[in-house]
Regions:
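Pocket-lining segment of extracytoplasmic ligand-binding domains
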Residues: 102-104, 110-114, 142, 179-269, ...
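Segments of small-molecule ligand-sensing domains
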Residues: 260-331
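Bilobed "Venus flytrap"/periplasmic-binding protein-like clamshell domains
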Residues: 41-69, 73-77, 132-198, 315, ...
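Extracytoplasmic
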Residues: 41, 70-72, 82-85, 92, ...
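Acidic, polar ligand-binding/catalytic clefts
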Residues: 95-130, 212
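Sec-exported extracytoplasmic/periplasmic mature domains
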Residues: 63-71, 91-95, 110, 155, ...
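Short, low-complexity disordered leader/linker segments with a strong preference
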Residues: 1-43
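Conserved N-terminal glycine/acidic-rich loop preference
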Residues: 36-45, 54-61, 84-105, 135
Length: 331
């Protein structure tokens, strides 16, 4: 099986993190059980995202912790183009673990949206880790108060074929609209931000963690407000698309007058379905037993909660992960 390693930067990052985390051990070593041969002699590739994003450094911190906690394990972090590429890498056996958005995995499993006509197999869920929030940004002076007010407005729904576009279309659908009801643009987040600053856009969609630095920076030049996605429409979205969860953005995140109610997908860890139960069990156990250390290494680690480990999961848990969550009463 061909396995692709990118530049040594990823490995160097993990080693550097290992030095910074030395002496910050969690609840003790997790020794691999004797049953079940280790895949690739315990050497694993962890596909993440771009080096300037969240997935890559967070994955590096996870790898360092798990390498130190599980005897015989050597996880190397790989920089990638994020969710869609990661799912393909894991499906082909070119990566063993990956971080992806749960909605994108759902599309892959069903062969729809970004994966139209190419249903993906061989990928299991390990854990749901933190929310990626659907944010609908408008100018504070735009006069747009609700999603229903988007009719006839200039709206960016994200790059064509992106996860953001899929989220935006689903939100419009829940409110009884399609792209025919708005003056639609399919722009990247950077392009949307530039157009928004130049008053060439009314609202735009972004799916990301909060606070989103780019939104904070935009607010300096043009005051922003976020729209609520709530009520019966949010309930419909969660019912129709189980990868969504409801969530509130506290008012102090962006300085909004009140908390914003919206929906979120989840960043999740996936694995090859053919990894044996023991190695995925040990990976999962080591991760959750060392969350305080992970939180010290990366801010997103503080958002990972054991009780949310199965939130928004629509593709089956790997048996090793399911075993651990059963032991600790989750799911």
């Amino acid at each position: 099986m061909k396995r692709k390693f990118k530049s040594g930067l990823a490995l160097l990052t993990v080693l550097a993190m290992g030095m910074s985390l030395a002496g910050c051990g969690g609840s003790g070593d997790t020794t691999a059980a004797e049953e079940g041969a280790l895949t690739n002699n315990g050497n694993y590739i962890f596909a993440t995202g771009g080096t300037s994003g969240t997935y890559y450094p967070l994955g590096g911190a996870m790898a360092t912790i798990i390498n130190g906690a599980v005897e015989g394990t050597n996880i190397t972090v790989q920089s990638t183009g994020a969710s869609k590429e990661n799912i393909m890498l894991v499906s082909k056996g070119e990566a063993d673990y990956a971080i992806v958005q749960n909605d994108v995995l759902d599309y892959a499993d069903k062969g729809i949206q970004l994966f139209e006509g190419e249903k993906i197999t061989g990928v299991s869920t390990v854990a749901s880790i933190y929310p990626e929030i659907v944010q609908l940004v408008v100018g504070a002076d735009s006069g747009i108060k609700t999603v229903a007010d988007l009719k006839g407005k200039r709206v960016s729904i994200g790059d064509a074929g992106s996860g953001v576009e899929a989220n935006a279309l689903q939100v419009l659908e829940a409110y009884g609209m399609t792209v025919d009801d708005v003056n639609v643009s399919r722009l990247s987040f950077k392009e949307s931000g530039n157009a928004f600053k130049d008053n060439q856009l009314d609202p735009f969609f972004v799916t990301a963690g909060v606070p989103n630095t780019a939104i904070v920076e935009l607010a300096v030049t043009r005051p922003v407000q976020l729209l609520n996605i709530d009520g019966a429409e949010a309930e419909k979205l969660v019912a129709d698309y189980p990868f969504y969860t409801t969530i509130a953005i506290p008012k102090d995140v962006y300085g909004t007058p009140e908390d914003i109610s919206t929906i979120a997908v989840r960043a999740i860890i996936v694995s090859r379905a053919d990894l044996n139960e023991t190695e995925v069990y040990n990976f999962t156990k080591a991760l959750y037993e060392n969350l305080p250390t992970l939180g010290e290494a990366h801010a997103k680690g503080k958002e990972i909660l054991l009780e949310q480990a199965t939130d928004g999961v629509t593709v089956a848990l790997h048996p090793g992960a399911a075993k651990y969550f059963s032991e600790v009463g989750v799911g």
